[in-house]
Amino acid sequence: MLGILKTRTYWTVSIWFFCMYGAFFSLSGLWAGPYFIQGYGLDKSAAGGVLFCLALGSTLGPTLIGFLTPWLRLPKRGLLLVACSATLLLGFPLLLPRPVIPAALLPLWGVAFGIFCGGFGGIALTRIQDDFPPEIVGTATGMINIYTYLGSALLQLASGWIMEAQAPGAGAYTLPQYSRMFILYMFMFCCAFAASLFALRDGGAAGTRCSGLQSGAR
């Protein structure tokens, strides 16, 4: 286990999961509903539809990506940069202090955001499968999955503190208050992008270093 913690691969993938999946589950589970109700003026039924589309995108994403990957010319690790870039682009409207996404397009936005932010975890885990010996892939994967839950929990706390600091004791928030809070999530997406760059730059050398763990795993 200590050998796993010493590898760059482990930390780059862990940071990616902490930032991307932690942010996705925190945002979709805690703030997306109130944001679209209070900020965009949707009723609960319409907001629930957007939440459903977020979940649908994250569910269909891995299957869709697995189907398309063999037909794409990008390497699997390069797809992480695509996911982060698309997430940043789709998340940009959340930073604006006024509604900019037409209500009719919100379900489509939800599916797309779910796919790119919550559907690329399988691609990230191929880094572990490629760089670690089979004997410890399961251990390394289990250790990395912890960061999804850790990221979600900590980001819910941090975002709650930000909103409470802006409007102490308020039961509802304004769109500008949400937009300032979403800076935290965009920062997480930028960190995930940086982690993807490190993973790509690491190249085949990481596999050579990680393969040295095989003797210790026996």
Please state what every model-predicted region is:
Residues 34, 125-131:
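Intracellular helix-loop hinge segments at the cytoplasmic ends of transmembrane helices
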Residues 76-124:
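C-terminal transmembrane helical hairpin of 12-TM major facilitator-type secondary transporters
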Residues 161-188:
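A membrane-interface helix-boundary motif in multi-pass transporters
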